[in-house]
Amino acid sequence: MNIGCIVQARLGSKRFPKKILKTIKRKTILEIVKSRLEKIKSVNTIVFAIPQNKKNHELEKFLKKKNFLYHKGSEKNVLQRYYFTAKKYQLDIIIRITSDCPLIDPYLCEKMLQCFIKEKCNYLSNILKRTYPV
């Protein structure tokens, strides 16, 4: 089973442009997010889903330089971007991640993933109704 994290990433934030390329202790937010996702034991693919436009060319260059997997798709239709990213990398289960969350908890993600598999869910979330941790 191919389990992957798809990280939704873009540079076009109006409040804090390019925030995902800003650094904390010499690591970009994106690098921190990826390193935390790598701690999710059951995940075997981490891929960035980025908009296909000139505004995100710098992001694409960064991802290439770091040898991070990525897929470009619609800026406006994020669901479509996820769909084609999952299809390209043949993902059976997707964990949806936002790129501006350097405090993502890999242990909570693993716990939710195991719940998803055990209960044979179609969809699992802890934000529709706040139920932290699971």
Where does each model-flagged region fall?
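Conserved core of the sugar-phosphate nucleotidyltransferase
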Residues: 104-134
